[in-house]
Amino acid sequence: MICSRWFFFGWLIVLVSFTSSMINAGTGSYALGFFIVPMGDELGISRLQFSFIPLFKLLTIPILPLLGVLVDKKNGARILVAAGSLIGGIALAATSLVENIWQFYITYGVLYGLGTAAMGSQLVGPSLISKWFVQKRGRAMAIGTMGISAGGVIIAPIAGLTISAMDWRSGWLALSIVTIVAIVPPAILFIRRAPEDIDLLPDGGTLATEEHHISYEPEVISWTLIQSLKSRTFWIFSLIQALGICGLVPVLFHEIAYIQDKGFQTEYATIVAWTLALSALISKLPFGFLSERMDVRKVLALCLIPAGISTFLIIPATSLFTLLLWGIIHGFFMGGFPTIMGVALPTYFGRQHMGSIRGVISPIIIVVSSFSPLLGGILWNDDSSYKSAFVLFGTTWIIGGLLPLALGKPKPPDIQNSDIRIGL
């Protein structure tokens, strides 16, 4: 197994998480905006009909807790990511052939939704990184979640440029090829559940390394799923996650169309979206290091409140310069959110059952990420403007940034009334 003084196998886990997050976010959020106008023109799909697409993710809710349990099982994550990526890639190829809205709903909404649920960039990747890293968790989570922003920096331009040079059908086909080639082989080769499975400890220690054993000891006590569900802290974190997603997803979903509504061509909208994604990518490492050194509650507030305020800046923007400025500022603060949440959960609940815990939080994320873009489409239909929608989404960020103040410090679970034996 690959491990030496200079290299830790866990960084391969981070690499796969980065790639999976990049493809998932790129094809599911950043790139989708480029298809709204051309598919709408050719197939007669309205903005509101496009906004229904995320609702099909609701079909995956019953299986998400089960997928979370599988992540905590040996070889479960490897099978999930490889199979999900293959299904997702095939679904994207099928989307290039659609002729009406219902075919689009089936191929992209249902089939691709099932594939990405199994791919689990926000379930599998952060859960595995939590298991493989403790002292270096902030930086590892930052690099892994950089893939989310890389979806906008790398995957979205692939879609946008392919559509501009060819057509939207070629755009879907290009995304299909990238999904299968970039994820399936690395997932099969590199994904392992936890360092203990290959006689290692988190952060690069071995079972015989006393120094790492000492640093590993505080992480031994982990909350089970049942203990977590009985905790007030768990539900506050779930609400913070929901509010952050409500501010993040619909802005990514509608930003391209909003910029085009302001009179800018697709190429300029691509530049703004790319700038936002690049800024979000760059911000993850600083927020990751802050999460290792500061109280994670303060880091959450430092990220979410400015993310909300900066959301409002796109509303008065009327020039390319002001749009680029918005992309830089909002992208920086918005981009730190997945990294900080990835660190916060294992900081409070430990790492052993993180897959099961995230498997319960994931349905909440799915519901919010499904309905919030639809709400944006409804508000646009009311007055042909996204102004009220962006005010609402910015406000959810700010509320989410205030909630960490209601959290106490991390503490061990109360085991008196919990059954630890079942590991749930």
Task: Locate the predicted segments by residue.
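Hydrophobic core of transmembrane alpha-helices in multi-pass small-molecule transporters
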Residues: 22, 91, 103-119, 322-335
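Extracytoplasmic gate region of multi-pass secondary transporters
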Residues: 28-37, 226-287, 372
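Central cavity-lining transmembrane alpha-helices of secondary-active solute carriers
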Residues: 54-69, 274-286
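Helix-to-loop junctions at the C-terminal end of transmembrane segments
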Residues: 64-76, 283-295, 380
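C-terminal ends and interior cores of transmembrane alpha-helices
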Residues: 86-99, 306-318
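Cytoplasmic helix-loop-helix junction between adjacent transmembrane helices
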Residues: 112-146, 350
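Helix-loop-helix hairpin linking two adjacent transmembrane segments in secondary transporters
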Residues: 148-197
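Symmetry-related core transmembrane helices of the 12-TM Major Facilitator Superfamily/SLC fold
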Residues: 172-189, 388-406
